[in-house]
């Protein structure tokens, strides 16, 4: 790369020298002046003419209408300082001159005066016609044409040399070529062992790796490997990393491109790039094509607004044709990632194109611990850092969040000139990631501090009493971002379902802040605005999605609707005005009940509430153990009890393959046992014939439903 840049700069420098030389020659040819010429004013010329110092002269009309007079002196004259600087530099100092020039305005009186003076002095006058600048005119006409043809020639020659960027050779003529960057298999060092927290997803991709390594193993049994694998999940879960790991394990060429790189301002460019991409991949088969953020080009057709989507739809049509046009034995597999699968075209998701869809969700506690260990390899950790505890404290964090957490902790440690990352650094980094940097210099009155302290203590008291689903992780009154303080609630365990009891407890916890304000200060403040926002969202989901309302019944009114604006199949709202009013009534009922419950809890624990609030005013931040100790004994403990178990780590490719076989054997045994039980029950005529319930559950993807980690931000 360094040599290429050096050659580019050398060629540019040579071109610059050539251009400067041409300009200098043109200037020398058309604009040079004689160094032995003295310029005279009109008055001086007439004076010299009357004094009989002029031998002869010529009068010639100029381009600008001014007459030019040029002639010879009878005797050599001394040169003046008005000589041209260019002439002085090139020819040296001139001691005397024999020629002169002068300019006269084109009026009859001036010309008549000059002619009369010349006749009296006996000086010959030689009139000349206006000179025609033939070469200048020809250059003005021909030069733009030559430049245009030179540019066309440069573009055509550059396009034949190969693909280039928009600023290099061939850049203008290479719009139809793919921008996919083929990665060398030898340079791809990412393996399955580098991907943590996605063990089930890696097992799903083992077959893809096996096919790329040994396609005959599948083709001889009549099996067809999936032509496309769609990696779906929220941002930051590692979809791109998984695709790189597949290419690294298979040791095959890896073509990566973004969905937005297909479409340009020119018509037909996207479809041409798709054809070029698949053509290059087939030449390098077995290979992998990875399209990142495929929703940029794969959105549902016919749902656009304004009719400006023709180019994108042509590109999508070409992708559909290419994916359904090549055979699996050609060894080209398409991997794509998206976090908006709901807007993808149904033809793109059908069998034969993206046959397999893998949900890459947020990792569980073991996955988070494994991810932390991967990102902590190059960071020195202090003895008080327990990655297992950090994993338990960060539910809902994805891989990108955990990497950012450790990076922030390392930056804080470097800022404090520490030799290792401590637990305090990680704790501060977690607060920065969740709520923003601390604003310790913000000046607040004592009344505001007390209001915030009792507000957050109210959240803590309700959370400590209603602790079946959640625990109080931390409470602080240190301002961070736009929050004046917050109470951090975490699920006790990894939750995949939320019961009605859990939802109502969470609502009561959110209402604890306003309940404390009314009980202590007897005045409401704006600090509970974020509490109400989250409480309204939870209550609305209970009513419209989860069927937790007797008045509305077990119906889903809103759900995970398609948010694609141009989708004609997405009416909003999908219910009547009367139903909308009933939803508002039920949401209001749930929030009011939660508020009354929070008031009752705080009234029954006044001493604990006051103790936690006073501790917040003194220490500003309390962790889980300190809060629980204050609630139970009224004192703050001095140390914490830590749990030690075998640390989690990401599985390698061979371990993932073995786990896949093991899980498959277990699933088959469970399925056989379930079928036997179903047949026995059917013989007893207790239930009708149907697919076993366990098999139905196994077919459904497991989705992790976690609410926001920060259950309150005191705005």
Swiss-Prot record:
Functional note:
Acts as a processive, ATP-dependent zinc metallopeptidase for both cytoplasmic and membrane proteins. Plays a role in the quality control of integral membrane proteins. Can complement an E.coli ftsH disruption mutant.
What cofactors are annotated for this protein?
Zn(2+)
Give a yes or no for keyword Iron in this entry: no
> Some GO term, biological process aspect, for this entry: which one?
protein catabolic process
Q: What is this protein called?
A: ATP-dependent zinc metalloprotease FtsH
Question: Which Pfam families does the record match to this protein?
Answer: AAA (PF00004), AAA_lid_3 (PF17862), FtsH_ext (PF06480), Peptidase_M41 (PF01434)
Binding residues for Zn(2+), per the UniProt record? Answer: 455, 459, 531
Side of membrane Cytoplasmic, spans = 1-10, 159-715
Positions that bind ATP: 233-240
Mind telling me which InterPro entries this protein's record contains?
A: AAA+_ATPase, AAA_lid_3, ATPase_AAA_core, FtsH, P-loop_NTPase, Pept_M41_FtsH_extracell, Peptidase_M41, Peptidase_M41-like
Residue spans crossing the bilayer: 11-31, 138-158
**Where does it live in the cell?**
Cell membrane
Q: Active-site residues?
A: 456
Q: Which domain of life is it from?
A: Bacteria
Q: Where do the segments described as Disordered lie? A: 167-187
Question: What does the record say about how the cofactor binds?
Answer: Binds 1 zinc ion per subunit.
Under the heading SUPFAM superfamilies, the entry gives:
FtsH protease domain-like, P-loop containing nucleoside triphosphate hydrolases
| Similarity field | In the central section; belongs to the AAA ATPase family.
- Report how it sits in the membrane: Multi-pass membrane protein
Which organism's genome codes for this protein? Answer: Oenococcus oeni
* UniProt topological domain (Extracellular) ranges: 32-137
């Amino acid at each position: 790369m360094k040599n290429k840049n050096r050659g580019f700069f050398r060629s540019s420098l040579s071109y610059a020298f050539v251009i400067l030389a041409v300009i200098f020659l043109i200037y020398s040819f058309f604009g040079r002046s004689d160094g032995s010429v003295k310029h005279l004013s009109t008055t001086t010329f007439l004076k010299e003419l009357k004094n009989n110092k002029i031998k002869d002269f010529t009068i010639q009309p100029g381009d600008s209408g001014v007459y030019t007079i040029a002639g010879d002196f009878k005797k050599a004259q001394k040169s003046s300082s008005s000589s041209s600087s260019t002439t002085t530099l090139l020819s040296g100092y001139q001691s005397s001159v024999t020629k002169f020039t002068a300019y006269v305005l084109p009026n009859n009186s001036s010309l008549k005066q000059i002619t009369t003076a010349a006749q009296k002095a006996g000086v010959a006058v030689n009139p000349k016609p206006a000179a025609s600048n033939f070469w200048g005119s020809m250059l003005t006409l021909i030069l733009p044409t030559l430049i245009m043809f030179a540019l066309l020639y440069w573009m055509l020659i550059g396009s034949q040399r190969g693909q280039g960027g928009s600023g290099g050779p061939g850049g203008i003529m290479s719009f139809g070529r793919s921008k996919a960057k083929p990665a060398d298999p030898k340079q791809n060092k990412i393996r399955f062992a580098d991907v943590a927290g996605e063990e089930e997803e890696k097992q799903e991709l083992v077959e893809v790796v096996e096919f790329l390594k040994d396609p005959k193993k599948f083709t001889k049994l009549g099996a067809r490997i999936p032509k496309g694998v769609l990696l779906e999940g929220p941002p930051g879960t590692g979809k791109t990393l998984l695709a790189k790991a597949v290419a690294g394990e298979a040791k095959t060429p890896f073509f990566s491109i973004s969905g937005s790189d297909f479409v340009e301002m020119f018509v037909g460019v996207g479809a041409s790039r798709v054809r070029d991409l698949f053509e290059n991949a087939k030449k390098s088969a077995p290979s992998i094509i990875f399209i990142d953020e495929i929703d940029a080009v794969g959105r549902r057709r016919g749902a656009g607004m304004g009719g400006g989507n023709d180019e994108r739809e042509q590109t999508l049509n070409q992708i559909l044709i290419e994916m359904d046009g090549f055979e699996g034995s050609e060894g080209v597999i398409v991997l794509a990632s998206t976090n908006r699968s709901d807007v993808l075209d149904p033809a793109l998701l059908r069998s034969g194109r993206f046959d397999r869809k893998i949900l890459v969700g947020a990792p569980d506690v073991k996955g988070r611990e494994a991810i932390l260990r991967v990102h902590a390899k190059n960071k020195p950790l202090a003895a008080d850092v327990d990655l297992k505890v950090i994993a338990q404290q960060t539910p809902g964090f994805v891989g990108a969040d955990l990497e950012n957490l450790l990076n922030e902790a390392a930056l804080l440690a470097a800022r404090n000139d520490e030799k290792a990352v401590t637990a305090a650094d990680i704790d501060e980094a977690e607060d920065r990631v969740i709520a923003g940097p601390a604003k310790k210099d913000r000046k607040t009155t004592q009344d505001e501090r007390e209001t915030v302290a009792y507000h957050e203590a109210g959240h803590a008291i309700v959370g400590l009493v209603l602790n079946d689903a959640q625990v109080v992780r931390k409470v602080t009154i240190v301002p961070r971002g736009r929050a004046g303080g917050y109470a951090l609630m975490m699920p006790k365990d990894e939750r995949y379902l939320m019961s009605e009891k859990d939802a109502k407890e969470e609502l009561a916890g959110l209402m604890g802040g306003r309940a404390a304000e009314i009980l202590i200060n007897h005045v409401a403040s704006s600090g509970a605005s974020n509490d109400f926002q989250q409480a309204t969202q939870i209550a609305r989901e209970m009513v419209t999605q989860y069927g937790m309302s007797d008045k509305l019944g077990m119906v889903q009114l809103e759900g995970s609707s398609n948010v694609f604006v141009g989708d004609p199949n997405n009416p909003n709202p999908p219910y009547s005005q009367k139903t909308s009013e009933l939803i508002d009534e039920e949401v209001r009922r749930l929030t009011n009940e939660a508020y009354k419950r929070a008031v009752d809890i705080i009234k029954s624990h006044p001493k604990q509430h006051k103790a936690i609030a006073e501790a917040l005013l003194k220490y500003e931040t309390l962790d889980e153990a300190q809060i629980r100790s204050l609630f139970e004994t009224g004192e703050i403990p001095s140390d914490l009890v830590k749990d030690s178990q075998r640390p989690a780590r990401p599985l390698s490719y061979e371990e993932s393959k073995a786990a896949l076989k093991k899980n498959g054997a277990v699933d088959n045994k469970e399925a056989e046992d379930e079928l036997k039980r179903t047949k026995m029950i059917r013989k007893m005529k207790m239930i009708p014939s149907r697919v076993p319930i366990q098999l139905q559950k196994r077919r459904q993807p497991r989705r992790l439903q976690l609410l926001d980690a920060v259950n309150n931000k005191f705005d």
